[in-house]
Regions:
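Short hydrophobic core segments
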Residues: 39-49, 92, 170-180, 244, ...
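FAD-site-proximal beta/loop scaffold in flavoenzymes
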Residues: 61-85, 161, 169-246, 341, ...
């Protein structure tokens, strides 16, 4: 038993109902018989976690509406499904819980719709990278209703009506709320502890609260973001476990410090893996940082070895200093190990250009001689040296209409015919030297290819011949995925449906 091994007395079916810091006691209620008694403490650790955000919508609380936080919540949902055999579900919220639940319900054969206030799923990712997640969800039959506001619910004989602001309502046999979590800090507030963001518990780097001899850890505490130093709420199991160890060490006379949360996370999205660490481009700019990014599409392992899969990587770094700030990776193989390398690099304070120098394990079944992380480093190093100048998706509208620039697509004729951007002239990279006279001198040349590699080669050829060039970050593959996704979202937003 737990007590026999660790000499820790576990009291299940008991609830702490109040904390008395002045007497160093807690009031405890036995949930089986209603008895209330006092327990003394020398040191008190609070780890109440977070509770599902409960919006004050009409209809919250009806029988066919669920929240998902605990194992017991899972049992309730599963019991309802096994008993009632629902054919459809609406999930309000597009974060980790929403996506994981959507996949599981879809595997049961249910029609699943996700409603999200933002125009993207998975807020830790930038909107452009989230497009890859949207595409995977749609590919597996998940309906996305992005940019919509839920206003309430009505119970019907045949299910639930989900009321949307200024749009037709949705119908489903069941609804699950997965719109985020809120620190569960009622006890802490009543005990007079200092509270921070969303009434989370404020702690120092020793995980001590504002009240002596009371510590706190987990989803209920406010932490410092490791990259920005700003106060943050980061509800992840990894940081919570580390915080618990630090508290135990300090209670036992040690002096351990929590350095902050980096937000490293990974999620399975059907056959795909999506992972992130540090801060994304959106939040970096909100923090007032001057940033740049590289977007690349490397293979998960050597291309000549069977089974390799393309992944999409976005690495965020600070201009001038080239401080590594964050990364996002989406793909079907090898995503998790690359994000872990980048998370380690950020924690170690590596300069983004130093990624090129990392000595990473290589064999054809597992990687390439230049690992995807190395490739990101080479690209950033080229930017630092002035060898590579980029242009980005947000520049497309302006650049594509500029009469004082030259637009060249260096993919093959076949690739170009399958889809291209208006205004671009097709000169395949292998014909570039012979056709260089077709490119007007004296004007900047903006290049694009499928992934960014051939357009980089073209830029080196043209730069060697006296041209000023800019390479499109991410290539046509990235552009096509993002633009098509945005078109689907906007069309759905205008029409009221994404299906």
């Amino acid at each position: 038993s737990f007590f026999k091994r660790f000499r820790i007395n576990m009291k299940i079916h008991h609830e702490v109902i109040s904390i008395h810091p002045e007497s160093k006691t807690v009031s405890v209620k036995n949930l089986e018989n209603g008895e209330i008694f006092e327990e003394n403490y020398d040191k008190l650790i609070l780890s109440p976690g977070a509770k599902p955000t409960q919006p004050r919508f009409p209809g919250v609380g009806i029988d066919k509406l669920f929240t998902l936080r605990t194992v017991e919540d899972t049992f309730r949902i599963k019991e309802y499904i096994n008993k009632n055999h629902p054919k459809s579900a609406v999930l309000a919220g597009g974060g980790f819980i929403g996506l994981e639940l959507a996949e599981n319900l879809r595997e049961l054969g249910m029609d699943v719709t996700i409603v999200q206030l933002l125009k993207q799923l998975m807020n830790p990712f930038d909107p452009d990278m989230a497009s890859m997640i949207h595409n995977e969800m749609r590919k597996h039959g998940i309906k996305l209703v992005l940019g919509y506001t839920v206003e309430g619910f009505k119970e019907k004989d045949d299910g639930v009506e989900v009321l949307l602001k200024d749009n037709p309502s949705l119908q489903a046999d069941m609804v699950v709320l997965a719109i985020g979590v809120t620190p569960d800090t009622v006890l802490a507030k009543e005990a007079g502890l200092e509270l921070g963001i969303k009434e989370s518990i404020v702690v120092n780097d020793r995980m001590e609260t504002s009240v002596p001899d009371i510590y706190a850890a987990g989803d209920a505490v406010q932490v410092k973001h490791y990259v920005t130093g700003n106060d943050a709420l980061i509800s992840l199991a990894g940081p919570a476990n580390k915080q618990g160890r630090i508290i135990a060490d300090n209670i036992c006379g040690g002096d351990s410090r929590y350095l902050g949360s980096q937000g490293s996370s990974v999620i399975k999205v059907f056959d795909m893996t999506a992972a992130t660490t540090g801060i994304n481009e959106t939040n970096a700019k909100k923090s007032g940082l001057e940033v740049d990014t590289v977007i690349l599409s490397p293979m998960s392992h050597a291309g000549y070895y069977p089974g390799g899969k393309v992944m999409t990587m976005k690495v965020v770094f600070e201009k001038e200093s080239y401080r590594l700030l964050g990364a996002q990776i989406i793909g079907y193989e090898g995503v998790d190990k690359r994000i872990d390398v980048l998370a380690t690099a950020i924690h170690a304070g590596l300069n983004a250009t130093q990624l090129k120098d990392l000595d990473l394990a290589y064999a054809p079944p597992y990687s390439s001689a230049k690992d995807p992380v190395n490739m990101a480093g080479f690209m950033i190093d080229n930017i630092a040296k002035g060898t590579l100048k980029q242009w980005h998706l947000e520049d497309m509208d302006k650049i594509s209409k500029d009469k004082d620039v030259v637009l060249i697509d260096v993919r093959t004729v076949c690739e170009f015919s399958r889809g291209h951007i208006d205004g671009f002239k097709n000169i395949p990279v292998d014909e570039l030297r012979e056709r260089i006279s077709e490119i007007e001198k004296g004007k900047p040349v903006y290049l694009i290819c499928q992934s960014g590699l051939r357009s980089y080669i073209a830029s080196r050829i043209l730069e060697g011949n006296g041209y000023e060039t800019y390479n499109f970050s991410g290539g046509f593959r990235f552009y096509d995925a993002v633009v098509n996704d945005r078109a689907l979202i906007e069309r759905a937003y205008a029409c009221g449906m994404d299906y």
